[in-house]
A protein has these predicted regions:
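Catalytic cores of enzyme domains
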Residues: 30, 72, 76-294, 309-312
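Residue-level signal for secondary-structure boundary sites
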Residues: 55-57, 180, 300
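Non-catalytic, usually N-terminal nucleic-acid engagement modules in DNA/RNA processing proteins
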Residues: 1-88
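Extended, amphipathic alpha-helical scaffolds
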Residues: 333-349
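Short conserved micro-motifs at the rims of enzyme active sites and ligand-binding pockets
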Residues: 58-60, 237-246, 302-305, 348-349
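Short alpha-helix boundary/capping motifs
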Residues: 39-40, 122-123, 316-321
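C-terminal/domain-terminus segments
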Residues: 298-328
Length: 349
């Protein structure tokens, strides 16, 4: 018989950083479109696997010089390459023992609800009374909470004692009954410092508007995050003034064409292409992840510690109203021998 300890040890060998287990009864208050039993009626346990987003993958955005790394290596690469392999291989181990396992490495683009939480109009229909409309979507953050990985912070992000908000979560729904982990008491990490509110570049996290929900017997409350606004702020867009035309998303989104320009936390004239399907985080999760992480590290609450603080200088901003900074140096090694290359004093002596 496979035990919870066997599962956790195997998951970490396969690449997970943290692992938690929740009994299926903890989802008794889940909306039907987010209920694991809609996928596996005989489910007994949910296993949540946490994969750290490297602090270094945020460094380039913090410095304003290397934006693709977070979307590629810290977000998309984990979500679409690294995490699925671990989730699939752990599911194989469970099924080899005779218990069915549903691997879920990320949210499906086929889900019936949109990014805000409403059913998509004329998208899919239940196949029988009492069943959810396909596809069901399990909230990975809620799963992390119910499996004991961490708590839901004011920003709606899952916060863990190891990495704070720097985490991606995959889950396995299984009919294997496992010993569950205790749920973290809300307020253990998040003290409502509102750093996420202050630093969100689009004001998407309101200080005075919240959502309340009973999750696993706990009364939780988090910000009523404006997910529609976050969608274009996250990608580096800013609304244009009345009568002004913006072309930042032109050629990328017909619905957004002409409506947005680059924001002051974005150095790109036009929206770069996606990396790994959804990777386009120009804002670098400035409020919900970076500001929160900085706050938690300053308070000494995270076990993943570093020799130096993350932020060592004043955050930069792009002034799009001013003249562009002139680039008067060689852009590549190939140009270093050109006649226009500036030479050092030692080379000209």
């Amino acid at each position: 018989m496979i035990t919870a300890q066997d599962i956790k040890a195997a998951a970490k060998r396969m690449g997970a950083d943290i692992v938690g287990i929740g009994s299926i009864d903890r989802w008794s208050t889940a909306p039907i479109q987010m209920d694991p039993k809609q996928i596996m009626p005989n489910a007994k346990s949910v296993i949540a696997l946490g994969f750290r987003v490297l602090r270094g993958s945020l460094r380039g955005i913090e410095e304003g010089t290397y934006f693709s790394n977070y979307s590629a290596m810290g977000y998309g690469g984990i979500t679409y390459l690294y995490m699925p392999m671990t989730v699939i291989n752990l599911s194989k181990m469970i099924e080899d023992a005779g218990y069915e396992a549903v691997p879920m490495g990320h949210q499906s683009d086929w889900r019936a609800i949109d990014g805000v939480g409403y059913l998509r109009e004329n998208y899919s229909r239940p196949v029988a009374p009492g069943k959810a409309a396909p596809d069901v979507m399990i909230s990975m953050r809620i799963a992390g909470f119910l499996c004991g990985l961490g708590e839901i912070g004011y920003s709606k992000m899952l916060l863990t004692p190891e990495f704070g908000p720097r985490l991606r979560v995959g889950i396995i729904i299984t009919e294997l009954e496992l010993e569950p982990d205790p749920i973290m008491e809300p307020g253990t990490l998040c003290n409502r410092c509102m750093a996420c509110v202050r630093e969100c570049p689009g004001g998407c996290i309101p200080a005075d508007r919240t959502v309340k929900a009973n999750v696993g017997g706990y009364d939780l409350e988090w910000a009523d995050v404006d997910m529609n606004r976050c969608d274009w702020v996250f990608q580096g867009g800013a609304e244009v003034a009345e009568g002004e035309k913006g072309d930042y998303f032109d050629g990328k989104s017909e619905a957004w064409a002409g409506k947005y320009k680059p924001s002051d936390i974005n150095p790109f004239y036009k929206a770069p292409r996606n990396l790994y399907n959804t990777g386009k985080a120009i804002c670098g999760a400035k409020g919900c992840t970076r500001a929160c992480m900085i706050s938690l590290e300053k308070r000494g609450l995270l076990t993943n510690k570093f020799e130096r603080p993350f932020r060592t200088s004043k955050p930069w901003k792009v002034d799009w109203e001013s003249e562009a900074i002139e680039v008067d140096y060689t852009a590549s090694y190939e140009g270093m021998d050109s006649p226009n290359t500036k030479k050092s004093k030692s080379e000209t002596d």
